[in-house]
């Protein structure tokens, strides 16, 4: 069973899993935090996102539903998003073991717990220590993501045999395929249209095929003219695209960046805020791609503004990575490291359930 806010029901249903509805905080309380995050200092952003939103508003909203579901369904184990804390409050009190499943670098996840601690400790003395001590499952490679969690278990997701080929939106062109995405969060923000327009400008004279995803809530009419080599979709199955792409251009979100590396693909990272700078730096340090710093903002402030004047830098980085085979070679080296870890099924059986089928 997957437990989450009601908005996740459709996605979970499509995946074929049972869904349990928890609560979510009112949009009127969440929207000001979401808009403030890209321009907040690192210290303020940590408080806003981790203490106020995840540790406070989201946990409070999720607790009633989580308590009811865990008490009635009695799962053998709860696998939790590291920033979903209601299950960490409820499950241990019922004798149900929990484990964190990483969505970011371990140093980021550890920092999130520290920032959320003032809100979490109101629920139970020792809760923060319990969370830190619980098994930490991650698909990220140790070479790029050392972990301070005492029980860190690395795994990989095996490829799906039922992949859907990417449709030919480019009239039979065999030019390199570039997957361009800035994740699911950007589309909710007021800066989204400007970022997408800059990325499109960087693509307009490139000899590449471009598949851009913008999210289901983004108004595509704000993009302006679309270059003929670019096709825009709200959403695609990332695994399908990565199986055919030659390059990923993205914001450096963990799911996209490490998904690309797992597929052996080099990256051009244009970080915007939060942990995207850390992810981009690690990609560049591993020689698996390039990170583009724009003319406004800086990595120390963990935010940057992307404008039209940055399009040439992005275009140059794309040309460099596509023309330099060593980037792909290093990406494939990281992919091999990730593939050498146990499968997620093996991890669940041997680590969490003690070998129970």
What positions do the PLM features span?
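A nucleotide-sugar donor-handling region in carbohydrate enzymes
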Residues: 5, 9, 110, 115-188, ...
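A generic structural signal for short, solvent-exposed coil/turn residues
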Residues: 11, 129, 147, 172, ...
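Metal/cofactor- and membrane transport-associated sequence elements
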Residues: 106
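Short beta-strands and strand-loop turn motifs
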Residues: 100-102, 179-183, 293
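Oxyanion-binding "anion nests"
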Residues: 195, 199
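Alpha-helix C-terminal capping segments
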Residues: 124, 170-173, 200-206, 351
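Glycosyltransferase specificity loop/lid
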Residues: 1-89, 94-100, 110, 190, ...
